Each structure stands twice: as structure tokens, then as C-alpha cells.
């Protein structure tokens, strides 16, 4: 129990909390080395984790790392866990790939006894701290913790050392169409651009605006203006001029948004009648809203 608690507290600090400094313990030549130390494991006994958060590796940078490893060796051990007769990577797949390319037969590694969820959390935290994940990979990592491991957004934020709002905003990106998510993943669009584009309700228009923003390299502020113009134009094209809201109604909407912590739209269809729309961005977010409404 103490061991599990120590691992959980260490997650937000990354793998440095779980990996001893190189040289702090003698590196053995085989699995007979002390469990807490650095082992030299056969490279063919180590396998990548198909569910690891990072999916893209820059080939040019891999080549550079491979050349560095040929000259200097692997300076930081990879982190693995036992998997059948071999080992599965928790963190360090890039170093492992580069070591293979460099022709190494063994790599320094540390074996850790962790659960699947702990292994995924460690991989996610390490990639976040190294800024190795693009925004979509980061969002998909959070989503897996929520969907597969049944963590709430609040629990995810604690585990990875991020604000809950950061986790919630990242998850919102997954509502974007595939082609636009691709632009965010390859850096053509930033998180700020993506958040602005989420305000476009019609899918074809969102895709067109995203391409325009990427092609013209517009700033986030310019993108926000473009989205606002698009929304205003769409309302005019529909022939439905939005009725001017009274100060009382505006105040009510602002109060609802403050209490619920999300976007709220109020439409009056006739005096005293209308509809209220409340945005949510995941089942976890919906559950949070329902608890607020039930005053749980």
C-alpha cells in the first residue's frame, strides 16, 4: 500500500521521481542486477506499448538521436515493466527506436512493477513534461484515462499535475472533425486556433475556416474575429435576426454560465417562453453538470 501511494504521489513529478540518477547505482550486465538499479536488457526482449500516448516520431530527430547514441551511448535509461517473457516500454520508446537504429544489442533500463493504469499515467506525464505530445495526442491520453480507466476529469488533473480546466479544454479538441484535428496535430493550428474554431456550429464551414486560418497563418485573435464574422453572417443568411436580449436576460445567462462553468445560450421564442442550451464536452462533464443541477 505504501509503495502504491508513493507511486501515485510521484506521477505529477514525472519519471524523475521513480528513476534513480544514472551512476547512483551500478549498472549490471544482466537481470541479476539489483531491482532498484539500472539493468542492461537485450534490445530484442523489449517491446513498444501500442497504447502509449505518443504516436508520432520525427524521423529526422530520430536519426539525430541515433547518431548521438552511437557516439555517447544511451545516457538515460528507459522505463519498462515485465510482460510475459519480455518487457514492455513505459517511457523511452524514442530512445529504444534510436538504439535499434544505432545497432545496439542492449539498452539500459529500469524495471518497475506497476499496474496498467499507472504505466499509462507515467507515460503520459513524462511525455507532457518533455512536451513530446501534440495537443491531440494529449487530449486522447486524457480521454483514455476517463473512458477506459474510469477517472473523472478532476482525478485526471491531479494525476498528471494539470489544472482541471486544462484537461477539459484539451478534451474539447476531440469534437473537431478528423481533418481539423490533423491540422492541430501537425502544428498548422494551435490550441488557441482550435478553441476558437469550436465556436463554429456548421461542420463544412468549420473545415473551410480551419483551412483558411492554416493557409494564411492567421493569429488566434484574427481567427476569433473570423469565427465571429462567420457566426453573424450565418444568422443573417438564415433570415433570423437574433432578438436583442434585455439586460435582465443577459444577467441571467451570465449567472447560469458562472454557476455551471460552461457556455449557456438562452433563446426567447415568445414573451416568457424559450429554450436554454447548455454545452458539455464529455460524459464526465455532463455528470458534473447534472450533479450541480441536482445540488449533490
UniProtKB/Swiss-Prot annotation:
Gene3D superfamilies: 1.10.10.2830, 3.90.1530.30. The record marks 52 as: May stabilize catalytic product and decrease reverse reaction. CTP binds at residues 52, 54, 68, 73, 75-76, 92-95, 126-127, 130-131. Changing residue 94 to A: Binds but does not hydrolyze CTP, does not accumulate on parS DNA. Residues 199-221 bind DNA. Its main location: cytoplasm. Residues 247-296 are annotated as: C-terminal dimerization domain (CDD). GO terms for molecular function: DNA binding; hydrolase activity; nucleotide binding. Keywords: Chromosome partition, Cytoplasm, DNA-binding, Hydrolase, Nucleotide-binding. It catalyses: CTP + H2O = CDP + phosphate + H(+). The active site is at residue 93. GO terms for biological process: chromosome segregation; positive regulation of sporulation resulting in formation of a cellular spore. Residues 134-230 are annotated as: parS-binding domain (PBD). Disruption phenotype: Essential, it cannot be deleted; depletion experiments lead to abnormal morphology, chromosome segregation anomalies and cell death. As ParB is depleted Smc levels drop, suggesting ParB is important for Smc stability. One of its GO terms (cellular component) is cytoplasm. Mg(2+) binds at residues 126-127. Residues 223-249 are annotated as: Disordered. Changing residue 127 to A: Slightly reduced binding of CTP-gamma-S, no CTPase activity with parS, ParB is dispersed in the cytoplasm, 90% of cells have chromosome segregation defects. Does not accumulate on parS DNA. An essential component of the chromosome segregation machinery. The ParABS system segregates newly replicated chromosomes during bacterial cell division. After DNA replication the ParB-parS partition complexes interact with ParA ATPase, promoting the movement of the origin region towards opposite cell poles. Binds DNA close to the origin of replication (the parS cluster). parS sequences (but not a mutated parS sequence) stimulate CTP hydrolysis by ParB. Upon DNA and CTP binding forms a closed sliding rings that spread one-dimensionally over about 33 kb of DNA centered on the parS cluster. Homodimer. Forms a loose homodimer, binding of parS DNA and CTP cause conformational changes including formation of a tighter dimer, and closes a clamp around the DNA. Belongs to the ParB family. This is Chromosome-partitioning protein ParB. It comes from Myxococcus xanthus (strain DK1622).
